[in-house]
């Protein structure tokens, strides 16, 4: 094993001077002075392991906060798990067992009065703690905090030993709860060796006198714009054998609000003290600064500093940050609506599976992620199954106005935890830890299910007891005044604007907790997690990063089919990833715009699955694992702006939606249509007024003659002073969702200039990018990147004011690109500009040759929902033919128009597939010849190569269903021998 030089944590002057009013983390034991070793390889008991000087030279250096497996990766004993298939090759048995953590520390000489406490903010999953040869206690469950009195155990001025025996989470999913239950693997992240066991939060020493404070809570009890009545609660504990009389005092800032109360505690007494505006007039705040969700106002924050003094000396002190706000809810029409500070708000947000799949997200990492969410104009994050537990996450959400839909650690159908009482204790711990955060907007008991008895009743009662009933308790994440979850794959644009009764696959709008699409990142990011040899064509490594059967809910076959049908066959990884960004953008924009289109008429909010990336993958993200901004990011950012002009792709109305607190009485809406050469073909304008919480019509688009096969729609909304309120840009095909003509866009040479400034540790590039008036072509999907070094390496993370935008001839875009100065590296950062028609695109040598595309189709039957046979040959993998339910045989017939040689057929099944079927050909549509037959159909994507036959008609003849339903095909593709398939 790797040897590590012993380190000792030196607890500095704050302890020697007394930590009475210092922040809890001032005497931190976190850092890299720890070591780990498996219990099976350590013969000594905890009493010996925790003695100063114990021989741990053969142990592996560890980082706290962190995990056991993460420590081995950090030490170079395991390859980086995100790259290639490295994580799939790890010997999981090596980590799926109990481990010791160990460190030593010194408490300097000085003030020897009062109590010294050893504090743990979180260990996954159970832990036993030893100090200087003595067991001091333990923790059960990953939310349980540990606070141990070690006053009589530590050697002041000498070395002290600390050992923690960390126990592996046991059982699957709910059985292991409370824990990071998705660490066992999900359809967006691999299984993590050791299931993320480790000391994953901070460890620190604190010092108090006899009375200590815990769990301060500032609550908004009553609220109006002119006044807020607050209550302040804190737990006081006397650890001595004598009564203690003192004064609890507080200061709230801003405002300089002060208050105090004399309190006497009995020997060993622990008491919850609550102060409210009825008894403490200072807690009635006039003209409060309110906390608002992003887009509705500023997320104003206050701090409350509490101290308990005995004889004028501080015994203990705590500071809590809070926001003045009030949540309320209604379920009008059976739809859940959120209200903040008396205003109905529209949640636009995303799900977080985890912050990082190995718990390697800390501190400012959350600030980066939350800034991306704020700049996408999102206002809610669903903390899926409570898998993000860091205080820094909630702090960042508070600062950015990001509401949190917060959950407990249960998955649908997973049964009960192995110890329901440990679960309950952890749930109470979580409530106490996060209840002062204004961002927490809702509590949810279980992912896609109801907590099994007795947990549901316990959670409801404990939230009332410990959170005062201030937030709604929602037992089930997708039922009970919610509109369900899914689909998680991309659909046709029109479907996002249609309700369930109008041919849609999304169901009723309502409040949707999950809906999403596969999201392939840019090539520069793919190169960071796939070896060059595996970049193209798609292969098993793509599947291991979840573009394949590892993530069937993402519809990878449909995603690939749509990409090809809309943008043409991809000839390289670069071509594929470039086309993917366009698909990502138009799909994500349509999801949000489809929901916003129904604001006030059945839609109350939507959370995409997912808005952030915990592992480098091809699915469910807006920015990727490396902070690369995908087309989905730009689609979300465009759609979610507070006042927004958009195109309803289903009925061609131009509309304006308003999810702000501002009214716009006099707006001018304009629409232009341009051909690919930049020539204007249409201009329409109209006046419109927009009120908060509404979507209103501007005008209907009527398309002129002479449009290029792919053309562009530009929208602009200006106020009475002519200032731009919103702009939007779409590409459209004369044939629905067919944009292959973009591959023939004339090359364009853009002009760009930039200037660099540095302030507050941040670099800012201010750029001007121009498409010359003489270009004679639209500059499509322009991207600006800050780069460094000779290799033009992208500087990430970077906050860019716009991306994947388009420029008409003569247009200029003004941009800012901001990033940490430390990220820039050697030499000045530079601006790199590229666009779709600045790079060659793959063009097949011959037509791809789907002979069935848009040909006449007929079928033996069609289901009552009207999924007709033409849908199987429209090149759109989100529409389908469905037969009548429950009968065999059934058939689907295509008329190719003339006799054609046939060498290949591709089938893309919906869930209802054929187990036994034949592919048949005919010259006259009466007499049929089999060219393929099987009794082992498996559904999904079936590629049938090396066929031999000819005919004008091709028929799929199903004789045995694979499910209890009928037959349902997304796509039926037919190829001749000259096709490039």
Task: Walk through the language-model features, giving the residues of each.
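Short beta-strand-plus-loop segments that form exposed binding edges in beta-rich domains
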Residues: 164-168, 957-964
């Amino acid at each position: 094993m790797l040897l590590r030089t012993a380190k000792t944590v030196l607890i500095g002057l704050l302890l020697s001077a007394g930590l009475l009013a210092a922040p809890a983390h001032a005497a931190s034991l976190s850092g890299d002075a720890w070591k780990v070793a498996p219990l099976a390889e350590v013969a000594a008991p905890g009493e010996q392991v925790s003695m100063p000087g114990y021989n741990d030279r053969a142990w592996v250096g560890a980082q706290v906060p962190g995990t056991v497996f993460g420590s081995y990766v950090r030490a170079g004993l395991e390859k980086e798990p995100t790259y290639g298939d490295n994580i799939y090759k790890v010997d999981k048995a090596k980590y799926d067992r109990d481990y010791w953590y160990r460190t030593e520390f010194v408490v300097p000489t000085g003030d020897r009065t009062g109590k010294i406490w050893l504090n743990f903010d979180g260990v996954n999953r159970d832990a036993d703690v030893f100090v200087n040869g003595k067991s001091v206690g333990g923790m059960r469950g990953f939310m349980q905090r540990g606070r141990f009195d070690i006053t009589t155990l530590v050697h002041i001025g000498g070395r002290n030993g600390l050992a923690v025996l960390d126990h592996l989470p046991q059982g699957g999913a709910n059985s292991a709860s409370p824990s990071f239950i998705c660490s066992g693997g999900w359809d967006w992240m691999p299984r993590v060796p050791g299931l993320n066991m480790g000391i994953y939060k901070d460890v620190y020493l604190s010092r108090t006198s006899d009375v200590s404070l815990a769990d301060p809570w500032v609550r908004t009890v009553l609220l109006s714009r002119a006044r807020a009545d607050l209550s302040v609660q804190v737990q006081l504990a006397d650890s001595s054998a004598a009564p203690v009389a003192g004064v609890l005092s507080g200061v709230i800032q801003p405002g300089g609000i002060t208050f105090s109360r004399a309190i006497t505690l009995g020997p060993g007494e622990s008491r919850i003290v609550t102060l409210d505006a009825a008894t403490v007039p200072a807690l009635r705040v006039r003209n409060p600064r309110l906390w608002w969700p992003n887009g509705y106002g500023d997320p104003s924050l206050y701090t409350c500093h509490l101290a308990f003094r005995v004889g004028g000396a501080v015994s203990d002190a705590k500071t809590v940050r809070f926001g003045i706000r009030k949540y309320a809810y209604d379920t009008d029409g059976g739809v859940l609506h959120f209200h903040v500070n008396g205003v109905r708000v529209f949640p636009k947000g995303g799900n977080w599976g985890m912050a990082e799949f190995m718990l390697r997200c800390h501190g400012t990492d959350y600030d980066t992620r939350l800034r991306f969410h704020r700049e996408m104009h999102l206002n809610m994050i669903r903390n899926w199954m409570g898998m993000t537990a860091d205080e820094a996450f909630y702090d960042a959400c508070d600062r950015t106005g990001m509401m949190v839909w917060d959950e407990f650690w249960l998955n649908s159908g997973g049964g009960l935890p192995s110890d329901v009482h440990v679960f309950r204790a952890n749930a109470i711990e979580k409530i106490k830890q996060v209840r002062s955060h204004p961002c927490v907007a809702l509590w949810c008991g279980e992912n896609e299910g109801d907590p099994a008895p007795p947990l549901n009743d316990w959670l409801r009662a404990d939230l009332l007891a410990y959170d005062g009933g201030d937030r709604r308790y929602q037992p089930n994440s997708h039922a009970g005044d919610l509109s369900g979850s899914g689909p998680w794959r991309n659909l046709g644009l029109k479907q996002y604007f249609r309700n369930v009764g109008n041919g849609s696959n999304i169901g009723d709008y309502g409040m949707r907790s999950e809906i999403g699409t596969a999201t392939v990142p840019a090539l520069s990011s793919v190169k960071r997690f796939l070896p060059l040899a595996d970049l193209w064509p798609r292969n098993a490594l793509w599947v291991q990063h979840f573009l394949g059967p590892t993530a069937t809910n993402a519809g990878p076959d449909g995603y690939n089919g749509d990409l090809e049908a809309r943008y043409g066959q991809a000839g390289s990884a670069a071509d594929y990833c470039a086309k993917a960004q366009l698909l990502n953008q138009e799909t994500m924009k349509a999801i949000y715009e489809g929901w916003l289109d129904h604001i006030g008429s059945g839609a109350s909010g939507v959370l995409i699955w997912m808005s952030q990336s915990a592992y480098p993958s091809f699915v469910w993200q807006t920015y990727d694992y490396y902070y690369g901004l995908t087309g989905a990011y730009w689609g979300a950012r465009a759609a979610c702006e507070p006042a927004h002009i958009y195109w309803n792709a289903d009925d061609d109305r131009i509309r304006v939606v308003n999810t702000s607190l501002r009214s716009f009485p006099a707006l001018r809406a304009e629409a232009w249509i341009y051909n690919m050469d930049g020539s204007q073909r249409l201009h329409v304008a109209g006046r419109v007024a927009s009120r908060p919480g509404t979507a209103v019509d501007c005008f209907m688009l009527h398309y002129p003659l002479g449009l290029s096969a792919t053309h562009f729609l530009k929208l602009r909304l200006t106020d009475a002073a002519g200032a731009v309120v919103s702009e939007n840009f779409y590409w459209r095909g004369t044939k629905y969702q067919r944009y292959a003509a973009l591959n023939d866009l004339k090359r364009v040479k853009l002009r760009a200039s930039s200037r660099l400034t540095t302030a507050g540790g941040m670099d800012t590039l201010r750029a001007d990018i121009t498409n010359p008036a003489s270009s004679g072509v639209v500059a499509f999907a322009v991207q600006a990147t800050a780069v460094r070094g000779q290799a033009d390496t992208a500087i990430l993370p970077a906050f860019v004011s716009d991306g994947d935008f388009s420029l008409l001839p003569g247009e200029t875009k003004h941009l800012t690109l901001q990033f940490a100065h430390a990220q820039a590296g050697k030499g000045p950062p530079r601006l790199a500009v590229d666009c779709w028609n600045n790079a060659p695109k793959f063009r097949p040598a011959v037509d791809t040759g789907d002979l069935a595309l848009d040909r006449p189709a007929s079928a033996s039957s069609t289901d009552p929902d009207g999924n007709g046979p033409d849908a199987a040959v429209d090149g759109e993998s989100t529409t389908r033919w469905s037969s009548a339910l429950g009968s065999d045989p059934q058939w689907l017939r295509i008329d190719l128009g003339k006799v054609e040689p046939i060498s290949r057929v591709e089938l893309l099944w919906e869930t209802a597939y054929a187990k036994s079927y034949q592919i048949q050909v005919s010259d006259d549509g009466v007499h049929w010849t089999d060219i393929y037959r099987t009794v082992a159909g498996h559904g999904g994507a079936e590629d049938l190569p090396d066929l031999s036959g000819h005919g004008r008609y091709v028929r799929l003849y199903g004789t045995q269903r694979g499910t209890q339903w009928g037959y349902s095909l997304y796509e039926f593709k037919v190829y001749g021998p000259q096709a490039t398939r």
